């Protein structure tokens, strides 16, 4: 056992100035000192510089050139420059409205003979005389945002259109309230720019329309060629999405993807349908147990539908998935004794058994069992495989001999296979977190100024990145390459090969290849174009617990057909097997899109914010949120535990078992509290009956005492309503069919914040205490049930008012964790009863800096 130590240094004001990563900590010695310019700092440290106002004006991360930030007098970032921008003398500028909302982002190029320094630019803002570089009309507009109203200059093609034939039950929805023009505080229009490998240009327009609850009911997008994507949504009264239509007008053709959703009384999805134009309809049905756990999915209809069942252990961890085409089992603390597996009580998977079946539901392939071992940091260091539950362990299709440095960079990784091409014994050397050399091939890696891998030593690929740190070109010698186009918000809209006349285009859920419809995604798989896009058929995806596609299947009136089978090494590389059905499906490991070059799979998967290399288990780019995990390499995939964790969007990894465990703890507390409230209710009702039966009391005394008891009943009703609401919200958050992702994140010394990023991921950040988790889970429930919308900074965009949502959260906190966990307020102190949690009390709460929170 070795110590893994991360050092944090603070200035006299208590501000974080240095973070020395575990690998760098080994290089420290008594009396040693390092400057920010030293190689030690550049490779191993996070360094922050503050101005006299306490603002961070420079950030330095390991393996990256510094980032500079310039502020205005209102402490808002006005200009930012990273290493790649500095090479081109560029600055990213931000422009705001009177309420502090960003109205535009621009890219300004300093073409002067003497380049402006950060200090010079800051001095201009400090004197309220904005520098010409910031105000220059020659700067390139990346994004423009409009709020509260619809601009008169907005293209007419973005006008709202009522969709009257959407196939959903509109019971309870008043048609005249579907579109509401009260858009104060909401984004209404934005103009984006297309970013290619060689240019920034091509306008992309987007308009948003809302109902009276501030829910988006239509989004209209128009690209630089005049193609229009109109996404229309319908909700029920409590915010469940009932129907959604994506209508794409392109080249004189209108394609329509219709999706509908049904729910039970607890807002759990019970059915989803999807249909492209007038083609085959996809149908997926869901069933749940009494605990709210998903226990069944049915793909398709009729006699040949695929029925998938799920089972869980007593902790609520998934233990089994079984269908007619694929079956798997997970063991955590009860491994088979003859495999030599360890028992893990932390949620780590010890053994993973699986087997494919033929279309008749009969086993027609070997069953496989992976046995996993982890180090003390839950990093995978060994995997073994056995066939057909034999006690003989094979070296085929395994990754083992995995070792790490103290920053969790992979030092060694051995892979064995039936295919000689897949057999590898990797040995890597590093400078800080950057992989410098593959010792086995004596090949070197190269990086750009932002720490992105520029040359992949193993494949020979060269990768170039845009200002968003997203790949714009992946190429190798011989004019073989992939060229990407993104919008300025990071949305991928095109990819093409070097000599392709027609790119693959992405429009919402729709994908077009060579100008014809290729596929559309839905909750249970993809609808795939046939006959050059003239027709379509439904492909259902059977996945494992990581969301990786294991079987692609069709359901027809005459039978089932398995089109594709996939198995994976632990870090996500596909097995090379003969005799297995294959298809051209690109959405494989973790459900992410694999990149293809002239029909050949490139071991890079698009995780949205970053690309992942499953060959060696690292990301090509640094984690954009690396400041939340100083102790782990910004290139590491899921903290090097790919068996138990998933990466949602390339920005952070999620541990579903940890999330499920937190949710289970809260649910257990809710159930215990509800049972206690029922007992209290019975006792109060008994007392009321006794009061009524007491002949010695006057009628006036009876009414007086009964009124007091009924006040207690009213408080119990509030508690029951709040707890039931929270329970239903947690069920909604954890539903596999929920299109949005909810996750808990523990950050020490955090006051708690629930936010939703631009990809729809809601993070309930908390300080690790039970009361704080209950509080933030309540906000998560409000979002999941459609009563609250927040942005990536946690600011409300619509729904419940601040007092209403906070009263509910603090009431749940008090009931489940105790009134002593409530904060002290200048207006009422610390309440001891539910009625003390009021709007004035909330407004008197201060944070640790003495500032009012609300």
Model-found features: residue ranges?
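A motif-centric feature for acidic-aromatic and gly/ser/thr-rich catalytic loops and repeats
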Residues: 12, 16-18, 24, 28-30, ...
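Hydrophobic or amphipathic alpha-helical targeting/insertion segments
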Residues: 77, 86-122
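Active-site recognition of the HExxH zinc-binding catalytic motif
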Residues: 548, 771-785, 809
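Short turn/helix-capping motifs enriched in Asx and small/polar residues
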Residues: 557-577, 608-610, 614-664, 668-684
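Cationic, glycine-rich low-complexity segments
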Residues: 652-765
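Short pre-active-site segment immediately N-terminal to the catalytic Zn-binding motif
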Residues: 759-773, 799
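Active-site or metal-binding loop neighborhoods of secreted/extracellular toxin and effector enzymes
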Residues: 792-854
């Amino acid at each position: 056992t070795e110590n893994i130590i991360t050092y944090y240094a603070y200035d006299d004001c208590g501000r974080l100035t240095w973070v020395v990563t575990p690998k760098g900590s080994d290089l420290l010695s008594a009396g040693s000192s390092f400057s920010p310019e030293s190689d030690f700092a550049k490779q191993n440290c996070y360094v922050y510089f503050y101005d006299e106002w306490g603002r961070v004006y420079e950030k330095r991360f390991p393996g990256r050139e510094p980032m500079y930030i310039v502020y205005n007098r209102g402490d808002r970032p006005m200009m930012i420059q990273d290493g790649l921008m500095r090479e081109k003398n560029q600055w990213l500028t931000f422009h705001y409205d009177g309420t502090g909302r960003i109205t535009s982002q621009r890219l300004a190029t300093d073409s002067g003979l003497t380049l402006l320094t950060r200090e010079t630019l800051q001095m201009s803002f400090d004197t309220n005389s904005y520098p010409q570089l910031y105000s220059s009309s020659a700067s390139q507009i990346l994004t423009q945002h409009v709020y509260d109203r619809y601009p008169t200059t907005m293209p007419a093609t973005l006008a709202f259109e009522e969709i009257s034939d959407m196939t959903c039950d509109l019971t309870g929805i008043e048609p005249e309230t579907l579109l509401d023009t009260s858009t104060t505080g909401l984004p209404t229009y934005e103009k984006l720019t297309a970013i290619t490998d060689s240019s920034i240009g091509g306008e992309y327009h987007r308009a948003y329309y809302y109902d009276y609850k501030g829910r988006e009911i239509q989004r209209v997008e128009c690209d630089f060629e005049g193609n229009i994507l109109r996404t229309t949504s319908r909700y029920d009264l409590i915010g469940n999405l009932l129907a959604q239509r994506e209508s794409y007008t392109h080249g004189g053709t209108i394609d329509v993807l219709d999706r509908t959703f049904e729910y039970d009384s607890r807002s759990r999805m019970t059915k989803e349908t999807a249909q492209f134009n007038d083609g085959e309809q996809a149908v997926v049905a869901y069933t749940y147990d009494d605990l709210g756990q998903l226990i069944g999915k049915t793909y398709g209809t009729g006699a040949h539908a695929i029925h998938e069942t799920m089972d869980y252990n007593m902790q609520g961890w998934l233990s089994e998935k079984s269908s007619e085409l694929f079956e798997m089992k997970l063991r955590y603390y009860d491994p088979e004794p003859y495999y030599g597996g360890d028992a893990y009580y932390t949620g780590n998977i010890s053994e993973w058994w699986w087997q494919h079946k033929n279309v008749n539901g009969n086993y027609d392939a070997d069953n496989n069992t992976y046995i996993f071992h982890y180090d003390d940091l839950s990093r995978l260091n060994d995997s073994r495989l056995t066939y057909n539950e034999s006690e003989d362990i094979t070296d085929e299709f395994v990754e083992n001999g995995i070792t790490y440095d103290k920053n969790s960079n992979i030092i060694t990784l051995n892979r064995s296979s039936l295919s000689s091409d897949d057999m590898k014994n990797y040995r890597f050397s590093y400078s800080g977190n950057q992989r410098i050399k593959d010792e086995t091939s004596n090949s070197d890696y190269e990086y750009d100024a932002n720490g992105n891998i520029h040359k992949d030593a193993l494949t020979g690929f060269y990768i170039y990145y845009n200002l968003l740190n997203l790949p714009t070109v992946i190429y190798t010698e011989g004019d073989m390459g992939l060229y990407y186009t993104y919008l300025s918000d990071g949305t991928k809209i095109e990819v093409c090969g070097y000599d392709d006349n027609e790119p693959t285009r992405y429009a919402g859920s729709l994908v077009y290849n060579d100008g014809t419809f290729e596929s559309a995604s839905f909750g249970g798989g993809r609808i795939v174009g046939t006959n050059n896009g003239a027709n379509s058929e439904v492909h259902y995806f059977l996945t494992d617990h990581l969301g990786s596609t294991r079987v692609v299947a069709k359901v027809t009136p005459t039978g089932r057909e398995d089109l594709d089978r996939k198995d994976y090494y632990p870090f996500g590389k596909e097995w090379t097997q003969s005799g297995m059905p294959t298809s051209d499906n690109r959405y494989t490991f973790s459900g992410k899109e694999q990149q293809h070059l002239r029909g050949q799979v490139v071991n890079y998967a698009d995780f949205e914010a970053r690309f992942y290399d499953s060959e060696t288990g690292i990301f090509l780019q640094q984690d954009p949120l690396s400041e939340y995990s100083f102790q782990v390499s910004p290139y590491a995939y899921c903290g090097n535990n790919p068996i138990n964790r998933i990466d949602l969007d390339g920005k952070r990894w999620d541990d579903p078992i940890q999330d499920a465990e937190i949710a289970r703890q809260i649910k257990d507390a809710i159930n215990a509290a509800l049972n206690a409230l029922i007992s209290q209710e019975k006792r109060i009702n008994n007392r009321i009956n006794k009061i009524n039966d007491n002949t010695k009391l006057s009628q006036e005394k009876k009414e007086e005492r009964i009124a007091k008891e009924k006040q207690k009943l009213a408080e119990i009703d509030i508690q029951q309503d709040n707890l039931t609401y929270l329970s239903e919200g947690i069920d909604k958050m954890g539903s596999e069919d929920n299109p949005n992702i909810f996750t808990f994140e523990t950050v020490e010394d955090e006051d708690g914040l629930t936010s939703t990023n631009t990809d729809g991921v809601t993070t309930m950040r908390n300080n690790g205490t039970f009361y704080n988790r209950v509080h933030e889970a309540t906000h998560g429930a409000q979002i999941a049930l459609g009563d609250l919308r927040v942005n990536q900074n946690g600011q409300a965009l619509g729904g419940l008012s601040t007092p209403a949502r906070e009263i509910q959260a603090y009431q749940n906190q008090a009931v489940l964790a105790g009134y002593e966990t409530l904060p002290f307020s200048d207006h009422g102190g610390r309440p001891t009863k539910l009625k003390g949690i009021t709007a004035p009390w909330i407004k008197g709460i201060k944070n640790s800096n003495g500032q009012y929170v609300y």
